[in-house]
Amino acid sequence: MATIIQAKDLRAGHTFLYKGSIYQVIENSFNKTAMREGIVKCKVKNLRTGAITVEVLTGEKVEQAIIEKSKMTFSYDDGSGYVFMDNETYEQISIPYNQLSWEKNFIEEGTEVSVMRYDGELMGVSLPDQLVVTIVEAEEAVQGNSVQNATKRAWLASKWEFQVPQFIKSGEKVIINPSNGQYVGRAK
């Protein structure tokens, strides 16, 4: 039996069915005004297409989508998608590029992810809260720039550009938050 949820109860990470599609909540906001129904705005990712949109779900009820997750490791790019290997059965699957539009920026060989399925249909991957990645290129530190929180640009192999502290060099491993792509700290 399907579980029905009030839209105002949706939180980041929840998955639900809406207008024939399966969505995962990235972030949400609920604004309650006097004598009116609250306005629920959710930034959501369509798990079938990878598209990220904002849905206004004021007063709506949605059906919860139960997503099965299995741990897999990224192996290689086969030219049409990314190949992942199941950590227990060693089964390999290829996930098309369009299903990993955001996640592809942070996946390196050996990255462990959770592959998501709904009723056997492949929905994409879920990354851990923090990932260790390798800086392939970093700008030179500016001599004398000792202002608090001085940063410079750095790039991953995927060409993802983000800000890192001045002391980070090319080839170093750092920790990033894949939900926003920002630097968290040095990897140990």
Curated annotation (Swiss-Prot):
InterPro entries: Elong-fact-P_C, NA-bd_OB-fold, Rib_uL2_dom2, Transl_elong_fac_P/YeiP, Transl_elong_KOW-like, Transl_elong_P/YeiP_cen, Transl_elongation_fac_P, Translation_prot_SH3-like_sf. It holds the Pfam family EFP_N. GO terms for biological process: peptide biosynthetic process. SMART domains: EFP, Elong-fact-P_C. It is found in: Cytoplasm. GO terms for molecular function: translation elongation factor activity. The keyword Lipoprotein does not apply. GO terms for cellular component: cytoplasm. Keywords: Cytoplasm, Elongation factor, Protein biosynthesis. Involved in peptide bond synthesis. Stimulates efficient translation and peptide-bond synthesis on native or reconstituted 70S ribosomes in vitro. Probably functions indirectly by altering the affinity of the ribosome for aminoacyl-tRNA, thus increasing their reactivity as acceptors for peptidyl transferase. This is Elongation factor P. It comes from Ureaplasma urealyticum serovar 10 (strain ATCC 33699 / Western). The lineage of its organism: Bacteria, Bacillati, Mycoplasmatota, Mycoplasmoidales, Mycoplasmoidaceae. The gene is efp.
